[in-house]
């Protein structure tokens, strides 16, 4: 038997195929034809994106006369080519090409078809521990885009940023390739390296990343003075339970102000986003709305809000890497004035996909609805604007300098300005931020190289670039000026 899984996509999803007679595995939030299914966490060993998935079951058996006529023609073309083409043909490849053509005709970057082999690879990626680079990716239009790098992951340490566009893997173009195939290229054994060519700000950069074992922690709690900070990395199984337990503990410790840090949280299970909102939002209040055509259904909180959570002043911290289930949760909290939202605008993903699995193990995913906040805000392509904007430091938005580029005295290039800004932030004083590689920059580089046990030559080469990028990332993580600014407001 084939399976069907209805899924909501707040970033990107992977869906499963179905034959006309399929058994459904789903999570019912209420008794109706609206069903929510767990979103698939596509952790590409570079990690793809995690997205909550929702769907409406509107499947009827059989085809109408027009549909039968069209399918008969497709069958005739398939049979003719398979039997009579002058070269040997593959029945499987012809069938796959026909399906790919139908999906491509939708002109929808979030609808896709995966073969059995691709599906197997996808299923292997759905776990909390995996070997990869720790970056979540999605297909946006004809581009492969980074949704967000995971905190402390090899990708983040190498300088990968949200909305970076991946154009090549190991020097080979990935144009036109399905997301799952690209994921396979990025994957590999622990300790091996992969080079991604990314575009950011109109410039292309090669970034080499060492694959490592990635463990996805769901909730981390730290006390900062009188404020409890809960870093929520992903919405996975038991995230809501982990957060509720941590809040109870914080309440016992006397904490009455909390920050829910959703920065670079790409999403995850919609079910967990709803349950997490239910910690703060009372029973029978709408958490998210599902809409398809004229059909609209509200998914509501099923329990009373936590008494400890009710006793707390809540702030939510987001950025452009906050997507999918993060936005479902933030949108609900914002609509009910349960929290003030700080940071920068979120990613913006508000459409829903359904997944279908066929008997041969292949998968089909297609968009079938959208989701809205309790007050009917549609955030797709727009994101959620924070109540109070807190800008990230300029150096955190610097373009990564390609690892295959070398610069020396006398060069004039935009990347030279990046070096000057970055070195200045790292404590190597430079008076100007021009694009000219001058003697002042050369002296600063020599000091940097000497301090970091590199060859002291004043040239910006690959080894210098790697250490330069690593230290900027470490500085951003250590200082966290955005969080510190928020804590000053709250303490």
Swiss-Prot record:
Alphabetical UniProt keywords: Cell membrane, Hydrolase, Membrane, Protease, Serine protease, Transmembrane, Transmembrane helix
Subcellular location: Cell membrane
Name of the molecule in the record: Probable CtpA-like serine protease
Domain PDZ: 119-201
Transmembrane segments: 34-54
Similarity annotation: Belongs to the peptidase S41A family.
Main location: membrane
Gene Ontology cellular component annotations, sorted alphabetically: outer membrane-bounded periplasmic space; plasma membrane
Organism expressing this protein natively: Staphylococcus saprophyticus subsp. saprophyticus (strain ATCC 15305 / DSM 20229 / NCIMB 8711 / NCTC 7292 / S-41)
Membrane topology value: Single-pass membrane protein
Region (Disordered), start-end ranges: 1-22
């Amino acid at each position: 038997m084939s399976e069907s899984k209805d899924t909501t996509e707040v970033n990107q999803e992977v869906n499963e195929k179905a034959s006309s007679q399929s058994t459904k595995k789903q999570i019912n939030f209420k008794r109706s034809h609206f069903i929510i299914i767990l979103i698939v966490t596509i952790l590409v060993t570079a990690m793809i994106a995690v997205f909550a998935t929702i769907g409406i079951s509107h499947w009827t058996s059989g085809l109408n006369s027009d549909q039968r006529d069209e399918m008969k023609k497709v069958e005739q073309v398939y049979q003719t080519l398979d039997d009579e083409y002058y070269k040997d043909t593959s029945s499987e490849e012809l069938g796959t090409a026909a399906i790919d053509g139908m999906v491509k005709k939708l002109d929808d970057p979030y609808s896709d078809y995966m073969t059995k082999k691709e599906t197997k690879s996808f299923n292997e990626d759905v776990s909390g521990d995996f070997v990869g680079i720790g970056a979540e990716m999605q297909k946006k239009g004809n581009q492969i885009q980074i949704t967000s790098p995971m905190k402390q992951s090899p990708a983040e340490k190498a300088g990968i940023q949200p909305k970076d566009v991946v154009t090549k893997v190991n020097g080979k173009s990935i144009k036109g390739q399905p997301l799952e195939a690209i994921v396979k290229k990025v994957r590999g054994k622990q300790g091996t390296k992969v080079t991604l060519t990314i575009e950011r700000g109109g410039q292309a950069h090669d970034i080499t990343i060492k694959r490592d074992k990635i463990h996805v922690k769901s909730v981390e709690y730290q006390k900062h003075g009188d404020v409890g900070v809960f870093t929520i990395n992903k919405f996975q199984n038991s995230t809501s339970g982990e957060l509720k337990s941590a809040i109870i503990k914080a309440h016992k410790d006397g904490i009455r102000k909390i920050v829910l840090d959703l920065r670079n949280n790409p999403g995850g299970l919609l079910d967990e986003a709803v349950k997490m909102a239910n910690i703060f939002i009372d029973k029978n209040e709408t958490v998210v709305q599902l809409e398809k055509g004229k059909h609209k259904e509200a998914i509501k909180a099923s329990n009373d809000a936590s008494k400890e959570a009710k006793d707390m002043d809540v702030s939510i911290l987001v950025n452009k890497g906050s997507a999918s289930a993060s936005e479902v949760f933030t949108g609900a909290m914002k609509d009910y004035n349960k929290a003030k939202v700080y940071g920068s605008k979120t990613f913006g993903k508000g459409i829903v996909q359904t997944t279908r699995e066929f008997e041969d193990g292949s998968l089909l995913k297609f968009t079938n609805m959208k989701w809205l906040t309790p007050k009917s805000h549609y955030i797709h392509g727009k994101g959620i604007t924070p109540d109070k904007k807190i800008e990230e430091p300029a150096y955190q938005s610097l373009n990564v300098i390609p690892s295959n580029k070398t610069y020396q005295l006398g060069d004039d290039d935009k990347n030279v300005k990046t070096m000057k800004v970055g070195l200045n932030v790292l404590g190597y004083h430079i008076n100007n931020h021009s694009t000219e590689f001058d003697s002042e920059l050369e002296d600063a580089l020599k000091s940097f190289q000497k301090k970091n046990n590199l060859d002291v030559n004043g040239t910006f080469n690959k080894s210098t670039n790697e250490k330069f990028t690593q230290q900027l990332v470490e500085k951003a993580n250590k200082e966290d000026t955005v969080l510190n600014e928020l804590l000053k407001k709250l303490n």
